[in-house]
């Protein structure tokens, strides 16, 4: 006689030690933990101690550090646990091959591309938090999803909001999508004030708790620029259908406008667990301990148009979408080098966009990507050119 109890759902979390990964494990625990879920793989990078703790607590089958030099430390930390250990690029590909019904793709940067594409081709549902999959390799990634037969579930709060309110049978009637942005710590800063921005002031996001790089990307609005490109691929939009509005309270996460004048919006407290929980439970809605909105206390919601002189990243996103091809990969690669230079104190805050635009112009001749090697080549060329420009002191 059967009990009727369903088998635990198999999950893999790529990037479990980051903010998205930690919140994913938190959601899993709130939704029943090991009673309802089986963790196949956890991957991290240098935070071996946290990765080992997570693997033991969740009962993961495999723990992977993306850095080969941390393999011995992870192996030692998990000695006697029965949890397999792997490292480096080969370890990440091993993680992608492990059986899992649902994969959280939260590895930051191009390092997340290959394992996420491999998991997609295998047919897993992909909860996508890695931006490079769509920004750098959108067409190829979507092809992998189609060929594998799994679902693509956006985890970025803005895209998840659109996903929640986009009526599948009314896609033909979509007129526009509106991505909201808090404006970050420099929403009201002057151009002169932004010229003197430091890493510490740039990382202080008013609403969201995030890692260093994504906090600075949010401050420069490069994060929103990447989200614009992602939205185009995710929802089959033209560049003209994508708008950005500043909304400092971060309560409305995005809106969809229809041809009859209706606008549907998703509202909620700024908590990543909402989007993660929806992606994990889709098409059902989970019961999560998220702060409920008190509209009487909230009282008001503010909006304003973004200033693309102070935040040129938005203009660069439209330029990349208009040019097409590998310009998304070029934008992202150049931006990454400029961001690292800013963090290291070698480049000013405003010069990040200048460097990125110069590289985009210099590499505008590159052909569209026919395979992933073309994407990696465009990314590599963009990074090399950005480094060259900074060495020549052409900007900043």
From Swiss-Prot:
Q: Which UniProt keywords apply?
A: Isoprene biosynthesis, Manganese, Metal-binding, NADP, Oxidoreductase
One family from Pfam that matches here is DXPR_C
Give the family per the record: Belongs to the DXR family.
Annotated Gene Ontology MF terms?
1-deoxy-D-xylulose-5-phosphate reductoisomerase activity; manganese ion binding; NADPH binding
Give the EC number(s) listed in the UniProt record: 1.1.1.267
Which Gene3D superfamilies does this entry report, sorted A to Z?
1.10.1740.10, NAD(P)-binding Rossmann-like Domain
Chain residues that bind 1-deoxy-D-xylulose 5-phosphate: 131, 157-158, 182, 205, 218, 223-224, 227
The protein's annotated pathway: Isoprenoid biosynthesis; isopentenyl diphosphate biosynthesis via DXP pathway; isopentenyl diphosphate from 1-deoxy-D-xylulose 5-phosphate: step 1/6
Q: What does this protein do?
A: Catalyzes the NADPH-dependent rearrangement and reduction of 1-deoxy-D-xylulose-5-phosphate (DXP) to 2-C-methyl-D-erythritol 4-phosphate (MEP).
Q: Which domain of life is it from?
A: Bacteria
**Which enzyme type, at the first EC level?**
oxidoreductase
Sequence positions that bind Mn(2+): 156, 158, 227
Q: What is this protein called?
A: 1-deoxy-D-xylulose 5-phosphate reductoisomerase
Protein's GO biological process: isopentenyl diphosphate biosynthetic process, methylerythritol 4-phosphate pathway involved in terpenoid biosynthetic process
Enumerate the cofactors the protein uses: Mg(2+); Mn(2+)
Q: Which reaction does it catalyse?
A: 2-C-methyl-D-erythritol 4-phosphate + NADP(+) = 1-deoxy-D-xylulose 5-phosphate + NADPH + H(+)
Query: Which positions in this protein are listed as binding NADPH?
Result: 17-20, 47, 130, 132, 211
